[in-house]
Amino acid sequence: MEGGIGKRSHTRSFDTGNALRGRPPFDRGVPEVLGRMEKDPERMNELVRCLDSGDPVVRSRAADALEKLTTRRPDLLKPIKKVLLREASGSVQQEVRWHMAQMLPRLPLTQRQIPDVFSLLRSYLRDRSVIVQVCALQAMFDLSLKDPSLRGPVRELVEASCRTGAPALRARGRKLISLLKEGPDGL
């Protein structure tokens, strides 16, 4: 797999895809997978491959597990950056998109990649899912902390979301407005 971590583990006693498949909502398999991946990050390719599963539940739970794992271990993002960028650009599944939006600002992006990722996140604002929109708005704000040239466009998007967005988007917009006002530069 392009842009993965380590080699495929020879231990087959745990199947990541099966752990994420077909469980009731209250037992999604994500905590079990997280525990395995934290103990053996070399197996992360198994989790990344689940993003390509034919089962939307597995894709959703894989994205959830990746987002949670890389929040704790951001160093694991670098080897899978290309895969995540491709998945973020190609996925239409809302559950995958909102987790991708949360991960994108944490990727080790080059200055040339930041505008492309910002544009992708901006397109997420047109998603039917309000959760995707909220995560995208937050992600664009987070990207603007890395690239000051995005601060003006982010301020405009945040202000617009406060005026015209769904209630959850307006609430996130208000939170970001307060951060914009408190910020050292006053984004």
Language-model segments: what does each one mean?
Residues 2-187:
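Alpha-helical scaffold domains
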